UniProtKB/Swiss-Prot annotation:
GO molecular function: ATP binding; phosphoribosylaminoimidazolesuccinocarboxamide synthase activity
Keyword Ligase applies: yes
Annotated metabolic or biological route of this protein: Purine metabolism; IMP biosynthesis via de novo pathway; 5-amino-1-(5-phospho-D-ribosyl)imidazole-4-carboxamide from 5-amino-1-(5-phospho-D-ribosyl)imidazole-4-carboxylate: step 1/2
Name the record gives this protein: Phosphoribosylaminoimidazole-succinocarboxamide synthase
One Pfam family this sequence matches: SAICAR_synt
HAMAP family linked to this entry: SAICAR_synth
InterPro entries attached to this UniProt entry: SAICAR_synt/ADE2_N, SAICAR_synt_PurC, SAICAR_synthetase, SAICAR_synthetase_CS
Entry similarity comment: Belongs to the SAICAR synthetase family.
Length: 240
């Protein structure tokens, strides 16, 4: 059955989600928007939607090649992808390989310190509460996720981290940290949402130059879209 777009059901900071003629399938449309200060400042960038869509598709396929289930089905267009409709778990899972960002505000740790083993952090997805950090006990007690699924997700996260660190390292890049989300389809765990330079930090391995959304967040004197494109090309996701 050919998938056809129907109604817009959700619009976030970086994507719009549409229903389709198949109740088990959605369409994600990436946006040109980039935001900082919790969405208070938004700017549009040409080609950002295309880069993020292709980058996400490339990374998700790399991950799925290691027998990790993702929601990705197929590309629909330059800025749209067809995905499985998951029952999303309301938790953001963050993996940290180097000390940067909010970690520096919460702990007395030197910036750019290598973290071994990597730190896993959980954040409850709630804009009104500003996505508070939680632990496994909150997750279980508040019925956000089962203990069994937590164990599986932790194992998957470490596996994904090793996969991605290797991909970036071979491209002379450092994977500093990243955020992922998971959901359920017929009771099975799937990696959902996206992996892009909007929700990860990547530095050049030799110069430590920032090549992700921090360029925009910190108003650095760099072209953020050219950096996104360079990272994509360096890891093998060729962007025109």
């Amino acid at each position: 059955m050919k998938i056809k777009k129907k109604n817009k059901i959700y619009q976030g900071k970086s994507k719009i989600i549409y229903s389709t003629n198949n109740s088990d399938v959605l369409i994600l449309k990436f946006k040109k928007d980039m935001s900082r200060l919790n969405g208070k400042y938004i700017k549009k960038f040409d080609n950002k939607d295309i880069i993020n869509n292709k980058f996400n598709y490339y990374i998700m396929n790399k991950i799925s090649s290691f027998n990790i289930k993702t929601h990705i089905l197929s590309l629909l267009s330059d800025n749209q992808v067809i995905v499985k409709k998951l029952k999303m778990i309301p938790i953001e899972f963050v993996v940290r390989n180097y000390a940067y960002g909010s970690l520096l505000k919460r702990f007395l740790i030197k910036e750019r310190s290598f973290i071994n083993p990597p730190i896993l952090e959980f954040f409850f997805k709630n804009d009104g509460l500003k996505d508070p950090m939680i632990n496994e006990y909150h997750c279980i007690s508040f019925n956000l996720i089962s203990e069994n699924h937590i164990k599986k997700i932790k194992k998957i996260l470490y596996k994904i981290n090793n996969i991605l660190k290797d991909i970036f390292y071979k491209a002379e890049l450092i994977l500093v940290d990243f955020k992922l989300e998971f959901g359920l389809f017929n009771g099975d765990l799937f990696l959902g949402d996206e992996f892009s330079l909007d929700n990860s930090r990547v530095w050049d391995k030799n110069s430590f130059k920032k090549m992700d959304k921090d360029i925009f967040r910190e108003q650095l004197n760099e072209n953020v879209i050219e950096s996104y494109k360079e990272v994509a090309n360096r890891i093998g996701c060729l962007i025109d």
